[in-house]
Amino acid sequence: MRAASDDHPTQPGNFLRSVIERDLAAGTYAQRRFGGSPGDAAHHAAGPLDGARIRTRFTPEPNGYLHIGHAKSICLNFGLARDYGGVCHLRFDDTNPEKEEQEYVDAIIEAVHWLGFDWQVGGRSHLYYASDYFDFMYRAAEALVGAGLAYVDEQSTEEMRATRGDFNTPGTDSPCRSRTPAENLARLRNMKAGQLGDGAAVLRAKIDMASPNINLRDPALYRIKHATHHSTGDTWCIYPMYDFTHPISDALEHITHSVCTLEFQDHRPFYDWLLATLSAGNFFQLPVPRQYEFSRLNLTYVVMSKRKLREMVESGIVSGWDDPRMPTLV
């Protein structure tokens, strides 16, 4: 335990605190402006200097109830923001309309409050939804296509899996990869207009099919889902993928330290690639967010996967999400 100061609260040390303290000492984010709400570079440039010294976020998907593993992330993100004079945003990753429900949104809000945290700072709420940014994300997707950095792929899921390669074998280019930006833009707009069925095409980034990091082998950015969204209704039939959604949402919200669990460590190069690419196109104000990973909480002999917990509920193995054998925060 170390003595307290403005930049060094009396808290046990860990690498995230060291990163934040280094950034505060260097003034990494001291000159960033905040437009009062999420937005692009021009929006934030018109605002005052950001009064929050750091910005973190907790980003659950509203497809089930939170469990004790999420409590670690909640306490970490909200606690770091509190200890360093910052703000933690609560953002719902609501990009999969087939599995998300308002019931889970309400329960997650209640659970975060139950743990003693809030996203209201100075009379301003920092409760957001990824779906708030669908228009912006689509604009970014069209920009990538126009720059020759994304393309529409009509291969089947099996074909894409076969050409992706593995850890020992490089991937091979899709036959759709060589199309012109104009051709890809027309196909993307057809996707958006609902002219294709579910699974008929995806939008992929054009990076490097021979990359040793499989997540850089032309990852999917958008997929087609004709499903009613809990917030946007039937406005959209294409939805952004997780790896496309999070860096853009972080940048729009001016997050400084994007803290997530270790399974996303090898996704970080794409996170950095996307923000660097879009920043070069003046989408975002510099410096952009940085991603950091921590070890997730696991309990011996306890199922901690939300997907598996959902399967247990739906198959009747347990009586419900509030079954006392479940690790949920209900």
Label for each model-derived stretch:
Residues G86-H89, G116-V121, H246-T256, P287-R290, ...:
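Short acidic (Asp/Glu) and glycine-rich catalytic loops that position anionic groups and cofactors
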Residues Y104-S131, A140-A143, G148-Y151:
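A glycine-rich helix N-cap at a beta->alpha junction
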Residues S18, D106, E110, P269-W273:
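Residues on a specific face of well-ordered alpha-helices
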Residues R296-D322, M326-V330:
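Substrate/cofactor-recognition hotspot
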Residues Q11-E21, T28-D106, T228-T261:
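N-terminal catalytic cores of NTP/NDP-binding nucleotidyl/phosphoryl-transfer enzymes
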Residues A26, G79-V87, A111-G122, A251, ...:
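Secondary-structure transition/capping motifs at alpha-helix termini
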Residues L90, N96, Q102, Y129, ...:
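Active-site cores that bind ATP or allylic diphosphates and position pyrophosphate for catalysis
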Residues M1-Q11:
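Basic/polar N-terminal segments that are highly enriched at the extreme N-terminus
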